[in-house]
Curated annotation (Swiss-Prot):
<keyword id="KW-0673">Quorum sensing</keyword>
<keyword id="KW-0614">Plasmid</keyword>
<dbReference type="InterPro" id="IPR001690">
    <property type="entry name" value="Autoind_synthase"/>
</dbReference>
<comment type="similarity">
    <text>Belongs to the autoinducer synthase family.</text>
</comment>
<dbReference type="InterPro" id="IPR018311">
    <property type="entry name" value="Autoind_synth_CS"/>
</dbReference>
<dbReference type="Pfam" id="PF00765">
    <property type="entry name" value="Autoind_synth"/>
</dbReference>
<keyword id="KW-0184">Conjugation</keyword>
<keyword id="KW-0071">Autoinducer synthesis</keyword>
<dbReference type="GO" id="GO:0061579">
    <property type="term" value="F:N-acyl homoserine lactone synthase activity"/>
</dbReference>
<dbReference type="InterPro" id="IPR016181">
    <property type="entry name" value="Acyl_CoA_acyltransferase"/>
</dbReference>
<dbReference type="GO" id="GO:0007165">
    <property type="term" value="P:signal transduction"/>
</dbReference>
<comment type="function">
    <text>Required for the synthesis of OHHL (N-(3-oxooctanoyl)-L-homoserine lactone), an autoinducer molecule which binds to TraR and thus acts in the control of conjugal transfer.</text>
</comment>
<keyword id="KW-0949">S-adenosyl-L-methionine</keyword>
<keyword id="KW-0808">Transferase</keyword>
<dbReference type="GO" id="GO:0009372">
    <property type="term" value="P:quorum sensing"/>
</dbReference>
<protein>
    <recommendedName>
        <fullName>Probable acyl-homoserine-lactone synthase</fullName>
        <ecNumber>2.3.1.184</ecNumber>
    </recommendedName>
</protein>
Amino acid sequence: MQILAISKPRNIEEAQLLRSHHELRARVFSDRLGWEVNVVGGCESDTFDDLQPTYILAVSSNDRVVGCARLLPALGPTMVANVFPSLLSAGHLNAHSSMVESSRFCVDTFLAESRGDGSIHEATLTMFAGIIEWSVANRYTEIVTVTDLRFERILARVGWPLQRIGEPRPIGATVAVAGTLPAKADTFMRLRPANYRSQIISTFGQSA
């Protein structure tokens, strides 16, 4: 399994990986979680996909997308600020140039991959490491996101606790919470699985 960061696809292979990631989002958010999201032709997307985000993809050895997340600069339009302001205690996001938003995080939990820390899926840890690696490589120090309480517990369990920036509130069928996560080299080194590989150019002594 390796991590890729794709903004604009440079070739047919990257274009296919992006399509596969939209298909994964449809399976997870629409089919499994039952969210009211826009699915066309088996692919989930929204208006934030039109803002030239960077997609972090975890790709298996057989070129299957097994995890994904979407990253956008927090100073621009974001889901947390524009869709979920009710989750912010101040009513607005105190964004800065070193903050990036992570949204549409999901992992194909049906894959028969090994598990990492305890019962945490290896693909989940790989995605955490990939998001941090890309953020540090691009001089972001803080990641803002909206998640649910179950996933907040997973973050705490692996030693990457969410710093809440508002109280949890019901959003649809779940209880959501907004918060920030530090993007730090030592966190990356601690979370990455032993067989972690990526194509992100970073400062961690590897060619990503």
